[in-house]
Amino acid sequence: MNLMEIVVICSLVLGILLLNRPVTMLAQRLYNRHQFRRFIVRETFYHSVVSRHLVYYNRLGLGEQRKFLFRTWLFQHSKNFRYIEVEQTAEMPILVSAVAVQLTFGLDKFKLNYFDDIFILRDDYHYGFYSRPFMGHVDQTGIYLSWDNFMKGISKQTPNCNVGLHEMAHALAYVNFVTETEEDRHFKKEFPNFSKVARPIFTAMQLDGVKNLLGDYAATNYHEFWAVAVEIFFESPVNFRHELPELYEAMSTVLNQDPLSFISGNTTIIRRLQPATGMASAGIGSAGMASSSITSAGITASIAPAPTSAAAAAH
């Protein structure tokens, strides 16, 4: 191979590398434009379903409601919904998708792209060798939700317990720190700061038996602390901020949204920070996990086929 051939090959490789991101972004814009035309036809139906069930959605302004519904459409159409011993209805995938969008509404990345499959079961179920029934769990094969418990959560029948938010919180951590398949730069940048506040609270709960509104189940391990904190953040923001103000602010920052701003009438996402220029330690340390190993760099990919989530009636 002569010098000219080497130069040509290097130029081609460099050109591919330089064009990859713009081409990918263009393809994504074209895809979203196509999907938006399809979504518009169904927007009224989506609004009717989501507005009946999600208080969060009803507190958004009109522009943000459309953004919310379109994200719900995109999320739904990126997944295979599988129904186990439960009769499928049109509202099921919409509501599950809407809860995922609620959690990620302040973030740029919201599809949880590692997970192709979402399994909806009728009610509590048994998983693996665990003796206690489960309301939901997340593992390599997908996101699992029991429909009965999911509906109780979004209808406020079980105070401070929302299995949809709980499992989506696990899934969000999974795609950012385990598979790293859909990393949100803001979320990964801010998670170490969240952990600086959260870790001492978790440690005090686990080692010293300190009680707070998060409940005993949050002390199981740091995965569950995170997921339970997400539930309380959306379900009881007033009480959360009153009892654990620093943790509330840290959660508001890492998710880039503040539910209390919606309640007070300010329906905009609280901030849009500059993208991170680097990736810091996620600040998650070993918590005696049965299903995963954890390092200071984040949740590492040694997940066994075991759930990362709450057993039924866990908190």
Regions found by a protein language model. Name each.
Residues 1-32:
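N-terminal signal-anchor transmembrane alpha helix of single-pass membrane proteins
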Residues 25-133, 247-261, 268-278:
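A metal-dependent hydrolase signature that marks the N-terminal structural subdomain at the beginning
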Residues 79, 139-148:
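Glycine-rich, often proline-containing surface loops adjacent to acidic residues and nearby aromatics
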Residues 92, 157-161, 223:
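Hydrophobic (often cysteine-bearing) scaffold residues that line and stabilize catalytic clefts
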Residues 96-105, 125-139, 153-155, 178-282, ...:
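Metalloprotease/metallohydrolase-associated module, dominated by Zn2+-dependent proteases
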Residues 147-163:
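Short pre-active-site segment immediately N-terminal to the catalytic Zn-binding motif
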Residues 159-175, 227:
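Active-site recognition of the HExxH zinc-binding catalytic motif
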Residues 276, 281-286, 291, 296-297, ...:
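Ser/Thr/Pro-rich low-complexity tandem-repeat tracts
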